[in-house]
């Protein structure tokens, strides 16, 4: 398994798929990175030479925000929204949907398990 910026990527999968195992790299960005380094997207990740792995590491560290840095940036952005009392920040704080979805029904993923309320006594 080749290790790129601290992440083991699957060796048996094609390079364009293997790179998507890194947080922050999707299919489009994977293609772009492969094109910039002039690598074969159909080659298996195990077929990469040490020199190619080194170039890949250098490029990802210098030009892209991925893995831990990206996770930290997202968390700090959410914290900032909460501290400036933005509407989106308040939705994050209350664990409610942020992007305008309905909440009367659905939104269970965001709200969590149902909290049962006892029925009204006669």
Curated annotation (Swiss-Prot):
Disordered: annotated span: 94-122
Keywords assigned by UniProt, alphabetized: Ribonucleoprotein, Ribosomal protein, RNA-binding, rRNA-binding, tRNA-binding
One annotated Gene Ontology cellular component of this protein: cytosol
GO biological processes: translation
One Pfam entry name: Ribosomal_S13
Domain of life, source organism: Bacteria
Keyword Ribosomal protein tagged: yes
Positions with biased composition (Basic residues): 101-122
Molecular functions (GO terms): rRNA binding; structural constituent of ribosome; tRNA binding
Coiled-coil stretches: none
Role according to the record: Located at the top of the head of the 30S subunit, it contacts several helices of the 16S rRNA. In the 70S ribosome it contacts the 23S rRNA (bridge B1a) and protein L5 of the 50S subunit (bridge B1b), connecting the 2 subunits; these bridges are implicated in subunit movement. Contacts the tRNAs in the A and P-sites.
Complex formation: Part of the 30S ribosomal subunit. Forms a loose heterodimer with protein S19. Forms two bridges to the 50S subunit in the 70S ribosome.
Family named by the database record: Belongs to the universal ribosomal protein uS13 family.
Protein's recorded name: Small ribosomal subunit protein uS13
């Amino acid at each position: 398994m080749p290790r790129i910026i601290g992440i083991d990527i699957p060796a048996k999968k094609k390079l364009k798929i293997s790179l998507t195992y890194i947080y922050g790299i999707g299919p489009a960005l994977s293609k772009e990175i492969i094109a910039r380094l002039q690598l074969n997207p159909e080659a298996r990740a195990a077929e990469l030479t040490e020199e190619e792995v080194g170039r890949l590491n250098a490029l990802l560290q210098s030009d892209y925000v991925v893995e831990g840095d990206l996770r930290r940036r997202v968390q700090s952005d959410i914290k900032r929204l909460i501290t400036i009392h933005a509407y989106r920040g308040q939705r994050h704080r209350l664990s409610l949907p942020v992007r305008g979805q309905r909440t009367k029904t659905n939104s269970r993923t965001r709200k969590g398990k149902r909290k049962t309320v006892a029925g009204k006594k006669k």
